[in-house]
Design a protein with these regions (language model features):
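Conserved pre-motif I regulatory segment
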Residues: 2-38
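Serine-centered coil/turn micro-motif
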Residues: 1-2, 236
């Protein structure tokens, strides 16, 4: 559509065929009477966030809001920066809401979501808090949905009136298994990487190779590059 041309023309790169098709799938779904329920699956670096941005822009052009929930603050911040870069040049205001923000920062963001100042919210579990309200939430995007509980996903969806749902996953799942895990979702697969994007290599090692893995990371740090270590969140239990 003419409205989406503004989005495509503003991108600093050309979408892959798979990305273009996935966005068109989302738009077609959202134009139907029943809400969209779609899974976008693709390797790390395949451009799933660009697809989410396209869907969010379509929702914005129709006067509504979108929310993207990520399982960690690191991922939420990455999505926020990416979506902000894609959408704010088009006048779409994007907000970040995470648990580590100050009470004042959270208050300002929540006020902006409730009065419609922000069209897109990106965050962690902070999005599902009772004090987080939206003016007109029409699209809920979940990154790695299996990392969230049923109640958390339902809580976010309940902040809109039967909103459209888009799930993003980098986990390579066979189609039949995806239907078992995610339910009755339509599926879009990103089959190629954007031009110039290097494939991301993933390795799994046992505890016996931990020191070797750390040395591997240190080699890149010594070259001036960056890295991070993510661990499962645990509650500290103090002896009584």
């Amino acid at each position: 559509t003419q409205d989406m041309d503004s989005f495509y023309n503003a991108l600093p790169f050309i979408l892959t065929n798979s990305q273009q098709t996935a966005i068109e799938d989302c738009i077609r779904d959202m134009q139907k009477e029943q809400p969209m329920n779609r899974l976008v699956q693709g390797d790390v670096g395949s451009g799933k966030t660009a697809v989410a941005a396209g869907a969010a822009y379509f929702v914005y052009e129709n006067g509504c809001q979108s929310a993207l929930m990520a399982p960690t603050e690191i991922l939420a911040e990455q999505h926020y920066e990416t979506l902000k870069g894609f959408l704010e040049p088009l006048g779409v205001k994007v907000a970040l809401l995470t648990g580590s923000m100050t009470a004042k920062q959270k208050k300002l963001v929540k006020e902006g979501l409730e009065n419609g100042e922000y069209a897109v919210a990106v965050g962690t579990h902070a999005l599902v808090q009772q004090t987080t309200k939206f003016k007109k939430l029409a699209l809920v995007i979940t990154d790695e949905q299996h990392r969230f509980g049923v109640e958390q996903r339902a809580a976010l969806a309940s902040k809109g009136e039967n909103p459209h749902k888009l799930v993003m996953s980098a986990t390579p799942i066979p189609r039949t298994l995806a239907l078992m895990i995610y339910g009755d979702l339509d599926i879009s697969v990103l089959k190629e990487l954007p031009k110039g994007r290097q494939p991301v290599e993933t390795y799994a090692v046992t505890g016996k190779l931990r020191e070797r893995a750390f040395n591997y990371v240190k080699k890149y740090l010594d070259e001036g590059r960056q890295g991070y270590i993510a661990v499962s969140y645990t509650h500290l239990t103090l002896p009584t």
